Amino acid sequence: MEKFSDIDAWVFDLDNTLYPAQHNLFAQVDKRMTAFIQDALSVSREEAYRLQKDYLRDYGTTLAGLMNRHNMTPDAFLDFVHDIDVSGLSPDPALRDMIDALPGRKFIFTNGTQDHATRVAKRLGISDLFHDIFDIVSANYVPKPNAQIYPDMLAQFGIEAGRSAFFEDMARNLPPARALGMTTVLLREPDTPDYGGPVGDEHIDHHAPNVKEILARILDHLGG
């Protein structure tokens, strides 16, 4: 916990990080990705799903695979897959109070779009707490965990890696941040699979089941 005393920039992934995975928002995105690929490539649903997961594994995002393998332009894909129902989310006053209490500035770093991040943050009642969003468009469609975009994220936010913490639900997105000197936090409920695959503990400074649990611990440490 001691490293958090020097943090003045708090960087959060979005989906399944700022809200629990049980809300199944990303399940909606997942289904729409399959439907988009099925239509765009004229393949069966089963083949579309296989390609979707293969590209996620091999390229970091399904979109990156479609762009590299099929020369697909990103806008139609992004608009389609993020056209989801976020009404299942509701304002989270406890989360808001915790994020607001963190000393310094707060940011969102997502492989989704800025519009999607803003919609989700507004539903949670926390959108006004964030100073900036680094999305897939900001990254020129290069996704986490590609190491080249992490310095770009730091530069856009105007923050120092050694004074920044990064909260993420996919372990494979943490090593590039840790290599730059960011304090890394992996958020995952026990017995929940990490679809990005495991990474060594040397890349993860802290583990927690969810964002509110770790923020409570951080604020207790800072207040002590």
Task: Briefly describe each language-model feature range.
Residues 20, 108-110, 186:
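Hydrophobic residues in well-ordered beta-strands that form the structural core
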